[in-house]
Amino acid sequence: MDNEITSTQNPRIKAACLLRQGRGRQQQQRFLVDGEREIQRALTAGWPLEEVFVCESLLDRPESRQLYDQLVETGIPLCTVTSQVMEKISFGDRSEGLLAVARLRLLPDLDQLTPAPGMLVAVVESVEKPGNLGAILRSADAAGVDAVILANQRTDPFNPNAIRASTGIVFSMPLFAAPSEQVLAWLTGNGFKVCATRIDGSSSYLETDWTGLVAIILGEEAAGLSSCWSGAGVTTVSIPMRGQADSLNVSTTAAILFYEALRQRLL
């Protein structure tokens, strides 16, 4: 283990701080993994970790020490820092004493996604808020969604907020990225039933058959889905609402539809 870093002006610390921003992640081709649960899930998924910053005074739980010992066994470079330095590089107001730097991977194209009988995929188009994307990934994992496709991608899934909102599921959920038109062509070409969520959808989600090969299309609540999802071969689906609100948060919509699909598949 390296000598303890005590200054927030240390070059390694300054480089780590830049990873909070998308530009820094792209320039360095790295990103931060903040939190014990998130680091553990990255390890379990076999994600390449370049180094881990450690503040031993914050490792005050048995689970923290256990993860620390596991990191030591893997041979990943460890760097001790003071609590002040850890606070500087940690995301938000939570610091658990461990923060990893991971290697960025490009999201694969759709030609690397192989359809299978009964596959359920989610297509997330142009969602801007990292927290929403992370929450969608978390719900998708819980409900048994097989893959998530980012269409017309506008959000970095390795943004610290997305990672935290996903509780580290971003490391294990199969993720793909492609333009919306290409996604639609791939789905229809492979026999998927394409269900696009719209306020004025032609059928209620409760009246929709979610079994078989199904793709759930989700868009940013402000702008909605692009026009390519309103043509032939696309079923539009709505969620009934009885109050004054005219839309739901996209992650809430996702959870409702994912679990209706799961319910039908368990019958």
Regions found by a protein language model. Give the residues of each.
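Glycine/charged-rich beta-loop-alpha catalytic/anionic-binding loops adjacent to active sites
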Residues: G22, L113-A122, A232-M241
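Acidic/glycine-rich phosphate/pyrophosphate-binding loops and surrounding catalytic core
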Residues: D93-G118
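Amphipathic alpha-helical repeat scaffolds
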Residues: G35, E128-I136, L248-T253
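RNA substrate-binding interface of SAM-dependent RNA methyltransferases
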Residues: T44, Q70-E73, C79, Q84, ...
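Active-site/ligand-binding-proximal alpha/beta "capping" segment
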Residues: C195-A245, N249
